[in-house]
């Protein structure tokens, strides 16, 4: 059998959004490797099963990836597609991140109930629903007159709860709504200065096993996203945060992206070579502006900082993330 006729099993969470995101990879492979056999396997994760608590109240790491990681280890799947913001800071030693997709719109958005056309019509007797303290803390500054409550479930479930009248509005990621074709539900975009997005928001992470050749994905992965991921996650890691912590970072670039999504590299998945490390093919960018948000639990104080750095590799991006974290830690010392 030719190399591009090998079978590739993609693992995904079973929500509609997760499946749509996995289908972006599936569609790419089918377009450029039409003889490859591809199967999509879905499963519930721990984070999908516990819906009565906020994510930061559940505790633990990898709430949305543990089951997918085990499927990779067991050989039941060959590739996992994750929302990068759900991926723990520490990657298991026996697995690797192959690369990152081009970034969808990273901003958070306000969604009003159906029939409500303008923010001026919001009923502030009802809470605004959010799924994270990061969003709540930043939204409190924008809507000081509002109360806030947790809203869990997939995107469609949250929209249903909103339209049933449980909330005056909810805050979601623009990327999820766009990937589901629900842009019409967006009532207001928050700029990345008003509400700094979760680290990795809008980026997909492709995870696989060591010892497997994933070079067929060379044309899908983005060098810019690899650097952004390293910078944003480097900031979070340096401050000891995880995917449920009230901490966030966002990188913006001058210069062109190096994503190869428009065309395949001509390689194929051999399933026998060495695994490929994240961040391959990084391009040259003029500069990166990295913004960070951190909530200090000890003093209940919010910190925001930003830096600009010249970066061309994930390692340089990660160093910028650590530099930004160091600035916030120095500022924190003066208030404790």
What function would you assign to each model-found segment?
Residues 2-44, 49-50, 57, 141-336:
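Small-molecule-sensing regulatory modules
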Residues 9-11, 80, 98, 129, ...:
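Short, well-ordered beta-strand segments
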Residues 53-78:
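Short, structured active-site "lid" loops
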Residues 67-68, 118, 157-158:
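Short acidic active-site motifs
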Residues 73, 78-83, 168-173:
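Paired acidic/hydrophobic, glycine-rich loop segments that form the ligand-binding mouth/hinge
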Residues 75, 82-85, 207-214:
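Ordered, amphipathic secondary-structure segments that act as subunit-interaction surfaces
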Residues 84-85, 93-145:
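A conserved helix-loop-strand patch within extracytoplasmic ligand-binding domains
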């Amino acid at each position: 059998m030719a190399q591009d006729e090998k079978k590739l099993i993609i693992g995904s969470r079973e929500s509609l959004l997760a499946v749509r995101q996995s289908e972006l990879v599936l569609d790419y492979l089918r377009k450029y490797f039409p003889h490859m056999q591809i199967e999509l396997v879905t499963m519930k994760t721990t984070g999908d099963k516990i819906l009565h608590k906020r994510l930061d109240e559940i505790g633990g790491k990898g709430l949305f990836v543990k089951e997918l990681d085990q499927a990779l280890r067991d050989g039941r799947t060959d590739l996992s597609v994750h929302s990068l913001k759900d991926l723990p800071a520490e990657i298991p030693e026996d697995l690797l991140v192959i690369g990152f997709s081009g970034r969808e719109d990273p901003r958070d958005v306000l969604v009003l109930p159906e029939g409500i056309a303008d923010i001026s019509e919001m009923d502030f007797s009802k809470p605004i629903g959010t799924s994270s303290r990061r969003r709540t803390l930043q939204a409190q500054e924008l809507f000081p007159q509002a109360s806030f409550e947790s809203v869990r479930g997939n995107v469609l479930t949250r929209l249903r709860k909103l339209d049933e009248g449980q909330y005056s509005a909810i805050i979601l990621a623009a990327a999820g709504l766009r990937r589901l074709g629900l842009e019409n539900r967006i009532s207001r975009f928050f700029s990345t200065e008003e509400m700094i997005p979760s680290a990795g928001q809008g980026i997909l992470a492709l995870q696989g096993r060591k010892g497997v050749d994933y070079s067929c994905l060379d044309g899908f992965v983005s060098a810019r996203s690899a650097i952004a991921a390293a910078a944003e996650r480097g900031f979070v890691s340096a401050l000891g945060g995880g995917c449920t912590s009230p901490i966030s970072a966002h990188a913006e670039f001058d210069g062109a992206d190096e994503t190869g999504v428009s065309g395949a590299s001509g390689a194929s998945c051999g399933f026998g070579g060495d695994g490929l490390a994240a961040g391959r093919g990084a391009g040259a960018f003029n500069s990166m502006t990295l913004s960070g948000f951190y909530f200090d639990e000890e003093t209940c104080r919010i910190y925001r900082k930003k830096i600009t750095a010249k970066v061309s590799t994930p390692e340089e991006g990660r160093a910028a993330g650590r530099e930004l974290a160091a600035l916030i830690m120095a500022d924190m010392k003066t208030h404790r």
